[in-house]
């Protein structure tokens, strides 16, 4: 049966995902940055209270995936912490300035991760040649690749996702970006073994007093009075589609 991974940005989101049938969680912070490494407090509390597999993201900042030596050293320290806390896997990705997988750094990541399953995240979608990148990641021992098929969303990139799947059994190709209940069946019919979804909604902040003339963000247009939350009904609906597909 296809596996459903849900992207979560808090303990509350992780609990909702687990209760509604998620098979695995990608744990992140900073949704507006596309996901950054969670704090120690979030990592420890999720590790203590969530029973399904959780894979934290290792990403020190937003933007591109070419990191300074200092940033990369911090990534290795975060991997050490995630391993010490007992997580079964992690999510990360590093590129060269030319858009290739940085194999030298990936070797260091794989050594630091040890027995943990490593997912190469959507840095893959920024690679110059996805098919060469997949071969290199297979050689590195990466467990899976999260990809939208190098398009804005996975529905647009499905043909490339299918080509990547046809390239071999490993790494597992996990489709993500815009995967929802209304298009999930297309991915299952295409033979996608794992899907990744945020299943999220933005909820208004409970703050009654709001200083509308001030922002804590460099983006003055940012909405600081909304909060991301995993929608349990959306997770349950997707899990139901997967179960029914398996029963066919």
Swiss-Prot record:
The keyword Disulfide bond does not apply. GO terms for molecular function: copper ion binding. The keyword GTP-binding does not apply. Keywords: Cytoplasm. It is found in: Cytoplasm. GO terms for cellular component: cytoplasm. Pfam families: CutC. It comes from the Bacteria. NCBIfam families: PRK11572.1. HAMAP family: CutC. Homodimer. Belongs to the CutC family. This is PF03932 family protein CutC. The lineage of its organism: Bacteria, Pseudomonadati, Pseudomonadota, Gammaproteobacteria, Enterobacterales. The gene is cutC.
């Amino acid at each position: 049966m296809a596996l459903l991974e849900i992207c979560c940005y808090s303990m509350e989101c992780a609990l909702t995902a687990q209760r509604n049938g998620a098979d695995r969680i990608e744990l992140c912070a900073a949704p507006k940055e596309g996901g950054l490494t969670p704090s120690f407090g979030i990592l420890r509390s999720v590790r203590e209270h969530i029973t399904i597999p959780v894979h934290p993201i290792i990403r020190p900042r937003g933007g591109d995936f070419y990191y300074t030596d200092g940033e990369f050293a911090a990534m290795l320290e975060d991997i050490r912490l995630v391993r010490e806390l007992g997580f079964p896997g992690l999510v990360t990705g590093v590129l060269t300035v030319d858009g290739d997988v940085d194999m030298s750094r990936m070797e260091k990541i794989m050594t630091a991760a040890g027995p943990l399953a490593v997912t190469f995240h959507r840095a893959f979608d920024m690679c110059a040649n996805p098919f060469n990148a997949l071969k290199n990641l297979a050689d590195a021992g990466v467990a899976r690749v999260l990809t939208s098929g190098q398009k804005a969303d996975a529905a647009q990139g499905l043909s490339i996702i299918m080509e990547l799947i046809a390239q071999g059994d490993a790494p597992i190709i996990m489709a993500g970006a815009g995967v929802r209940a209304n298009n999930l069946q297309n991915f299952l019919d295409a033979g996608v073994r794992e899907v990744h979804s945020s299943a999220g909604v933005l909820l208004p902040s409970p703050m009654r007093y709001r200083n509308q003339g001030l922002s804590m963000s460099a983006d003055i247009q940012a909405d600081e009075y909304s909060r991301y939350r995993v929608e349990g009904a959306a997770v349950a609906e997707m899990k139901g589609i997967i179960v029914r597909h398996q029963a066919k």
